[in-house]
A protein has these predicted regions:
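Short gly/pro/ser/thr-enriched loop/turn and capping motifs at secondary-structure boundaries
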Residues: 3, 21, 63, 155-159
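Gly-rich Lys/Arg/Thr-decorated short loops/hinges at beta-loop-alpha junctions or inter-strand turns
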Residues: 54-58, 85-96, 115-120
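Divalent-metal (often Zn2+) His-rich catalytic cores of metallo-beta-lactamase-fold enzymes
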Residues: 76-82, 86-106
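Core dinuclear metal-dependent hydrolase active-site scaffold
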Residues: 18-77, 81, 138, 142, ...
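General beta-strand structural signal in soluble alpha/beta enzymes
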Residues: 16, 56, 89-90, 124-125, ...
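Single conserved hydrophobic/aromatic residue that forms the stacking wall/gate
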Residues: 1-6, 10-11
């Protein structure tokens, strides 16, 4: 929406849906189901008409131990499956690979172990939308006596927004990147 507003495109009839909310739009009953992903507040949509049910997941990650947001609800997806789904539209990185992706909680433990053994400056890259990873790195920086800097316009903007809406704690205080060399 920010890009649309920034480009001065008119946004008419916008409907905001909260995670867990159900709404009706014309012939469509839509349930907004919270799912885990590196982007906070990601939701799947269960779209039902009198003739069919479609599940649209967007990108997702099954994570029973997320750092930010609610855990994946296997129960809710089992209930949807029991009701019957006519089509699933989904996208998930590495979904066709065998095995599983570690939870963000497991990633945090691994990062902490690696960074604690390092001397001096540590540089970690991640997607700018990965608010949980920013929170993990801030905690590790504090634990190891380091400072955290968030570099890049997208990452800095995401960190600011996440803090404003309460996804990052007030204690999340990155220093300006130009001060990281001191």
């Amino acid at each position: 929406i920010g890009r649309l507003v920034g480009s001065e495109m008119c946004i008419r009839d916008r409907i905001e849906i909260e995670p867990g909310e159900e709404i009706k739009i014309g012939p469509f009953d839509i349930e907004c189901i919270p799912i885990t992903h590196s982007t906070p507040e990601t939701c799947a949509l269960s779209i039902t008409t009198s003739r069919s049910r479609i599940l649209h997941t967007a990108d997702w990650k099954i994570d029973a131990d997320p750092v930010v947001g609610a855990a994946w609800s296997a129960k809710r997806f089992r209930e949807l499956g029991d009701k019957g789904i006519d089509a699933v539209i989904c996208d998930s990185t590495n979904a066709l690979r065998a095995g599983y992706t570690p939870s963000e909680g497991e990633v945090a433990a691994g990062l902490r172990q690696v960074i604690q053994r390092c001397e001096g400056r540590v540089v970690v890259g991640c997607f700018s939308s990965n608010v949980a990873r920013m929170q993990i790195l801030a905690s590790i920086a504090q634990l190891t006596g380091r400072y955290l800097g968030v570099m890049g316009r997208s990452a800095a903007g995401m960190a600011r927004c996440a803090q404003q809406v309460g996804l990052l704690p007030d204690s999340f205080q990155p220093i300006h990147p130009e001060h990281l060399g001191y």
